Swiss-Prot record:
This is Riboflavin kinase. Mg(2+) binds at T44, N46. The keyword Flavoprotein applies. One of its GO terms (molecular function) is riboflavin kinase activity. PANTHER family: RIBOFLAVIN KINASE (PTHR40706:SF1). The gene is ribK. It comes from Methanopyrus kandleri (strain AV19 / DSM 6324 / JCM 9639 / NBRC 100938). Pathway: Cofactor biosynthesis; FMN biosynthesis; FMN from riboflavin (CTP route): step 1/1. It comes from the Archaea. GO terms for biological process: FMN biosynthetic process; riboflavin biosynthetic process.
């Protein structure tokens, strides 16, 4: 079983506002809150990575991550915990996306401001295997792991 870490380095890119709309829809906001244990900042943090890296991260998320089922026109998504420049965040892989060379991240805070980055800055994304992050969730969220 994979324990990690996988490290992907990519370029922060400004989005088009699709993530903000998605996160602001009550159904998705509630589901994201259920998974991450906090109210998400209304928007996503987009990072351009190599397609192979994106596909590896997506495969990990769809194998071991949390599923948000489709609802309405936006479809579903897979979520998987990560660190971006050392800060906790969640990778989001929507079923419907135009960004084949990007990964989207969500957090309870505005990552762009928290990390003090601008369009074009390089960031590091780190992910671990499910046994590692499930243990971390139990230690920080209690025995239920935040569920």
């Amino acid at each position: 079983m994979f324990t990690g870490p996988i490290v992907a380095v990519g370029e922060y890119v400004e989005g088009l506002g699709e993530g903000r709309r998605y996160v602001s829809i009550p159904y998705y906001r509630r589901e994201i809150e259920r998974v991450i244990g906090a109210r998400p900042f209304p928007g996503t943090f987009n990072v351009r990575v190599e397609r192979e890296e994106r596909e590896s991260l997506r495969e990990l998320a769809s194998s071991y991550g949390y599923r948000i089922e489709p609802h309405g026109e936006y479809g579903g998504a897979w979520l998987y915990p990560c660190l971006v420049n050392g800060r906790p965040a969640w990778l989001v892989f929507p079923d419907l996306t135009e960004h084949r060379d990007q990964v989207e991240l969500i957090s309870e805070t505005e990552l762009r401001r928290e990390l003090n980055v601008i369009h074009g800055d390089m960031v590091k994304i780190e992910v671990w295997g499910p046994s590692t992050w499930k243990l971390a969730r139990r230690l920080t969220c209690g025995p239920s792991g935040g569920r």
